[in-house]
Amino acid sequence: SVQDERTHILTALEEAQERADIVLITGGLGPTKDDITKKTIAEFFQDDKIIDYPEVTNFIKQMFKKYNIPFNKVQQYQSQLPSKATLLMNRLGTAPGMWFYENDTVFVAMPGIPYEMKGLMTYHVLPRIREKFHLPFIIHKTIMTYGQGESLIAERIADWADKLPSFIK
């Protein structure tokens, strides 16, 4: 956890870049004065150029219209991202995610609202990470049993389990 303070964020980003292949950042992407993460990330990447994404603006306008909320300049800020960022469209809220790649490190900035972050992770971040790092697709299955203890079941399937490939656990 890092304070919403410019120097703390910059230091954390520098340290993370030295140690990690993937850095996940949550929160601070909103339109209020205390949401400084987007601005600080742009500074970290030495990126003064801002790109306005009309698709984000249109999405926010549609969302606000649905709830009869006026669209204003503060909201327009949500659709402006640093030029080095790849837009990760957030269909569950107003703050889009951002994907950066620099010096062999991926940085992903996502909104701090848990369900919005989960949506971005599921539909944008994890698929990109799998592709970028050539990760295998993992299938997880749970087998429910009853009436017999774990040790008895383990004994019954031991021969079969021993023949499974090493990548199956």
Regions found by a protein language model. Give the residues of each.
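Short beta->alpha junction loops
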Residues: 1-7
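Helix-rich terminal scaffold detector
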Residues: 2, 12-15, 19, 25-26
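An accessory alpha-helical subdomain
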Residues: 102-169
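Glycine-rich beta-strand-to-loop/alpha-helix junction loops that act as flexible
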Residues: 25-33, 111
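Proline/glycine-rich low-complexity loops and linkers
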Residues: 35-132
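Short, contiguous clusters of charged residues that form electrostatic/catalytic patches at enzyme active sites
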Residues: 7-14, 79, 123, 155
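Short, basic, helix/turn surface patches
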Residues: 22-28, 78, 82-83
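Glycine-rich loop at the start of a catalytic domain that most often binds anionic cofactors/ligands
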Residues: 8-18, 36-43
